Regions:
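Right-hand nucleic-acid polymerase module
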Residues: 1-122, 132-270
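Cys/His-coordinated zinc-finger cores
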Residues: 126-128
Length: 270
C-alpha cells in the first residue's frame, strides 16, 4: 500500500459501454489529523444530489440497454392513491404482476422505479426502468389504473445521465428510487500513487488546451473521451479531475465486457 504523505488516487467505474472516473489527492499526514471544514447545508445538498445521479447512472449503465424500457405511469381520476404507502403498495403490486408475466416467458424482471408528486398539480405518478422481453402493449395493459406510456430506453454518448438526473432529483419525490435485488452493482477500481504531480499538471494543461482526449484515450484505449473537467480546491490546493468515456464500439449495450487499459494493479490487490 502507498505510504507517502500525499498521493493521487484514480477511482474508475466501468459500467457496460460507459466509464467514468475521478482523480483526486489523498492526504495522509502523520500524527494528528487536520481539521476538516464542514460544508454548508446547501453545498452538502448539491454534493448529495450529484452523488445520487452518478450512482443511478452507473446502475442503469450496468444493467440496461436500448432493448429495455422506460415507463411512465399515471392514475385516472378516482384511482389516485391518497398516501405514500398506498402509492408504493400499488406500484409493488404492479411490479409483482409483471414478474409473473416475465416468468411465463422464462425471463427475469429487472427494474428501477421512483414515485413522484407532480410539480403543478400535485398528482402522484411513477417512473420505471425495466428490462425488455415482454411486449410493450402488455406492459401498459397490466397497469390498468390510468395512462401508461412505454418507450425504448434511449442512450446518447453520455449514456442516460439526463434521465438519471431527473429520477435522482430529491424534490417532489417520496424517496430517490427503488430497485430490484437482481441488479448488478457497479464496482470501483482504485489506483493509488500511480499518477504523480507532473501527470496531474499534464492533464490540467491538456484540458486547458483542449487536447485532453489524447491523454485519456491513451490510458484507456478501448474508450473515447466524452468529457473531462478539473478544478482546484481553494482550501487544500489539490486538483480534482472528473472524466467520462464511451466504449469505441458503442452500442448502448450494458453487456459486461472487460475494458482494455494500460496494465496497472488496483490498490489492495495482491
Amino acid at each position: 500500500m502507498y505510504t507517502g504523505r500525499t498521493f493521487n488516487r484514480e477511482s474508475v467505474y466501468v459500467c457496460g459501454d460507459y466509464m467514468d472516473g475521478d482523480i483526486y489527492p489523498v492526504f495522509q499526514a502523520p500524527g494528528k489529523r487536520r481539521s476538516r471544514c464542514k460544508p454548508t447545508s446547501e453545498i452538502q445538498q448539491k454534493l448529495n444530489q450529484k452523488n445520487a445521479e452518478k450512482k443511478l447512472t452507473r446502475l442503469v449503465h450496468s444493467n440496461f440497454t436500448e432493448d429495455d424500457i422506460a415507463l411512465h405511469l399515471t392514475y385516472r381520476p378516482g384511482e389516485e392513491p391518497q398516501t405514500e404507502e398506498e402509492a408504493q403498495r400499488i406500484l409493488s403490486n404492479y411490479i409483482r404482476r409483471l414478474k409473473r408475466r416475465y416468468a411465463k416467458l422464462g425471463l427475469e424482471l429487472k427494474y428501477i422505479s421512483c414515485t413522484e408528486y407532480g410539480k403543478t398539480n400535485g398528482k402522484v405518478h411513477h417512473h420505471v426502468i425495466l428490462s425488455g422481453g415482454l411486449d410493450r402493449d402488455t406492459i401498459e395493459k397490466v397497469w390498468g389504473l390510468g395512462y401508461a406510456n412505454s418507450k425504448r430506453l434511449q442512450f446518447n454518448e453520455s449514456g442516460v445521465t439526463g434521465l438519471a438526473h431527473y429520477i435522482a432529483k430529491d424534490k417532489h419525490f417520496f424517496k430517490r428510487w427503488n430497485q430490484s435485488r437482481n441488479l448488478t452493482i457497479p464496482q470501483c477500481a482504485q489506483f493509488d500513487g500511480q499518477l504523480n504531480m507532473d501527470d496531474i499538471a499534464d492533464i490540467e494543461e491538456a484540458i486547458e488546451c483542449g487536447t485532453q482526449w489524447q491523454w485519456f484515450e491513451d490510458r484507456y484505449p478501448d474508450f473515447q473521451l466524452v468529457e473531462a473537467t478539473c478544478y482546484k480546491n481553494n482550501i487544500n490546493r489539490g486538483t480534482y479531475i472528473h472524466f467520462e468515456m464511451r466504449r469505441r464500439e458503442w452500442s448502448g449495450s450494458s453487456a459486461a465486457r472487460p475494458a482494455r487499459m494500460k496494465k496497472r494493479t488496483p490498490s489492495g490487490a495482491s
